[in-house]
């Protein structure tokens, strides 16, 4: 960060806050190669690590100085127009470098805001599991929840326009448009499964998408909090969680006060809560369903009028928390009453009182998980374990390590489940699938293979947490029983592991 700040101060004095000249500097691509300001396991530079070198970077910069290479022939789409060769490599290098450059002002703004508010930076807030304690604290007191799918922009120009409030350099925005027009089909780039979370050029498009979501959430927070410039601590924490730093000091109230003079009281609700992860959000309230419907249709019109994004009211579902569960971050969560009986003694008379309290119930999604295991050939659609034939050529230790890793990840992530019986069933499927895979490799039966290895094979599937607790407490102790029954939220989980990645 100190190195970045030094470079930026130098160019501020020379270029009047222009970021465009930084793209011609070698250290920018070196920082992009090293994942720049914020290292993250979510952003893997596939192919870029193996092909990047100082010679290629120097060649790239020298070719960018030759302006005739930027001439675009729209009619001839089959030619390699930018540099003549190594188009994919150069485009990925430019996108990574540009993403690092645009992140500089956001990172510096975050540091300055933390210094002004004297906020201690908590890395625990980055964990996905940190959302569930918030659910446990707030949602039992709420009545209705809206399941909102944030629509993707139809055109990438919308994403570029959201950066104009933060990036005051027109040359950088023009370069971004040139890059997107040159290398991508704007109509198909933002499909959620193939592009915006793709491994190639992921950092740049996460930056664009986060700027779009940040713009949407900043206006939503303004209407919710009716505050100036969104300088609340809660908004700062929200932007820290999405890795997109603090919103620029932009007079939001001057823009929207004239457009919504009678709307602020219309949506005033002190009990409304908002949670989001990627493109899915939950909007919960203690008020009546009428207010939730007003929020629903307001969001639809807001997306259509402000972002020119088509959305339908059917994409937003309003459910009563006491009667319906909501799917969020892989858990099926619901609010159920927890009735406790209290015996009261008054002089010679005694009577029983039922004390009903609402409690958040987080369930393990057994049916979708079996479908995921069946998709990657660990079991059939009925949940019956089968051998993993594609792993039969690997060594025994490699096969066991793969199964143990998947089982450990599932146990670690779903440790907050209220009822772990379904989780144990999934672990049983993985154990038996591992045994069948090893038996198939050695051309033996499952029974014979288990007799030869004994119980040591199954001990490999105990998670690290279970091993530690089993050493500290006896198997019959009440503490260990509470460990197996209770919910545990870990603050070191930054992403959801996909089973397909273990193919």
From Swiss-Prot:
Compartments, as annotated in UniProt: Plastid, Chloroplast
Origin superkingdom: Eukaryota
One function term, GO molecular function aspect: RNA binding
Pfam families: Intron_maturas2, MatK_N
Main location: plastid
InterPro entries for this protein: Domain_X, Maturase_MatK, Maturase_MatK_N
GO biological process: mRNA processing; RNA splicing; tRNA processing
Keyword Plastid: yes
Keywords: Chloroplast, mRNA processing, Plastid, RNA-binding, tRNA processing
GO CC field: chloroplast
Disulfide bond annotation, renumbered to this chain: none
The protein's role, per its UniProt record: Usually encoded in the trnK tRNA gene intron. Probably assists in splicing its own and other chloroplast group II introns.
Family classification: Belongs to the intron maturase 2 family. MatK subfamily.
Protein name: Maturase K
Organism: Rosa canina
Organism lineage: Eukaryota, Viridiplantae, Streptophyta, Embryophyta, Tracheophyta
GN (gene name): matK
């Amino acid at each position: 960060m100190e190195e970045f700040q030094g470079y930026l101060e130098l160019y501020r004095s020379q270029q009047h806050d222009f970021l465009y000249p930084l793209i011609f500097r070698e250290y920018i691509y070196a920082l992009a190669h090293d994942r720049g300001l914020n290292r993250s396991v979510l952003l893997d530079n596939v192919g870029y690590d193996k092909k990047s070198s100082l010679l290629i970077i120097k060649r790239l910069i020298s070719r960018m100085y030759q302006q005739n290479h930027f001439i675009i022939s729209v009619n001839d789409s089959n030619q390699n127009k930018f540099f003549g060769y190594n188009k994919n490599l150069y485009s990925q290098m430019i996108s990574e470098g540009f993403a690092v450059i645009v992140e500089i002002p956001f990172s510096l703004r975050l540091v300055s805001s933390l210094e002004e508010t004297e906020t201690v930076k908590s890395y625990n807030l980055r964990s996905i599991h940190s959302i569930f304690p918030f659910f446990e604290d707030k949602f039992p007191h709420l009545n209705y929840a809206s399941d909102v799918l944030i629509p993707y922009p139809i055109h990438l120009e919308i994403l570029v326009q959201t950066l104009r409030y933060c990036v005051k350099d027109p040359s950088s925005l023009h370069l971004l448009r040139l890059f997107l027009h040159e290398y991508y089909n704007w109509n198909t780039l933002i499909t959620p499964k193939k592009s915006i979370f793709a491994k190639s050029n992921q950092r740049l498009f996460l930056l664009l998408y986060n700027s779009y979501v940040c713009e949407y959430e900043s206006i939503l927070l303004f209407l919710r909090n009716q505050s100036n410039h969104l300088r609340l601590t809660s908004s700062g924490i929200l932007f820290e969680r999405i890795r997109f730093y603090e919103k620029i000091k932009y007079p939001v109230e001057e823009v929207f006060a004239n457009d919504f003079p009678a709307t602020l009281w219309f949506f005033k609700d002190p009990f409304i809560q908002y949670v989001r992860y990627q493109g899915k959000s939950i909007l919960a309230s203690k008020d009546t369903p009428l207010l939730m419907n007003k929020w629903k249709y307001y969001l639809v019109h807001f997306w259509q009028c402000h972002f020119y994004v088509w959305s339908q009211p059917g994409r937003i579902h309003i459910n009563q928390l006491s009667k319906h569960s909501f799917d969020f971050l892989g858990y099926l969560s619901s609010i159920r009453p927890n009735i406790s009986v209290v015996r009261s003694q008054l002089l010679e008379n005694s009577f029983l009182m039922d004390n009903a309290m609402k409690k958040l119930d987080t369930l393990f999604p057994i049916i979708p998980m079996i479908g995921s295991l069946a998709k990657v050939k660990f079991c059939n659609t009925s949940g019956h374990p089968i051998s993993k034939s594609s792993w039969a050529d690997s060594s025994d230790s490699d096969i066991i390590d793969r199964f143990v890793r998947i089982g450990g990840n599932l146990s670690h992530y779903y440790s907050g489940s209220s009822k772990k019986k379904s989780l144990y069933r999934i672990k049983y499927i993985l154990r038996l699938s591992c045994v069948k895979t090893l038996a198939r490799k050695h051309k033996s039966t499952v029974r014979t293979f288990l007799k030869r290895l004994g119980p040591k094979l199954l001990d490999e599937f105990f998670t690290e947490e279970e091993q530690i607790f089993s050493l500290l407490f006896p198997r019959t102790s009440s503490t260990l029983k509470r460990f197996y029954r209770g919910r545990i939220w870990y603050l070191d989980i930054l992403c959801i592991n996909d089973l397909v990645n273990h193919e």
